[in-house]
Amino acid sequence: MSSGDLVLKWAWPNPEDLRNAELTSTRESGEFETPPADTIFVTYFFRFNHHTGRFEEAGRLDWYPSSERAGSVYFGERQVQMNALHRKNKPTSRSRRFKSNKGNEYKWKKGSDAGMQELDFVCVDSWRRVVGRWSNESQTLTMTSGGFAIFDELVVTLWLQIWRREKGFW
């Protein structure tokens, strides 16, 4: 870890419902919030705005009512299908790929495939440079400077990896 890295500590107020999470660090903070309702299948993600002193909506996940796997993710106005943020390159692949807003490809790999613990994840760019590391033990995402440009995408795709792993369909 370098001094320029950003470390986000994740906390789940209710560990039984991973759709609600709080992220904190000394520089940035955010949260995922799913309103408790039977008919609404939306998870919002917020980022703290240091200029206004408030959390502001950065996007949302619209879940299909019959599925915990599929839906649409909105990064501001840009819509992406959830499955596009969790693509396998080939049927036997143990990593999951996604494209950033700028068209660059990234992939999340299981920690055991990157010399880390089984429940950890590491995200690399197309040049195999690490842009983020998830430590399940400490519940932290360490983002390198290479991940700052895709902050929202990195946080949301990690959240989806954790969600899918816990639901048994990573």
What are these model-derived regions, one by one?
Residues 56-92:
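Helix-adjacent hinge/juxtasegments
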Residues 38-51, 55-60:
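A beta-rich soluble binding module of mature secreted/lumenal proteins
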Residues 1-32, 36-46, 92-96, 101-170:
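Low-complexity or membrane-interfacial segments used for flexible interactions
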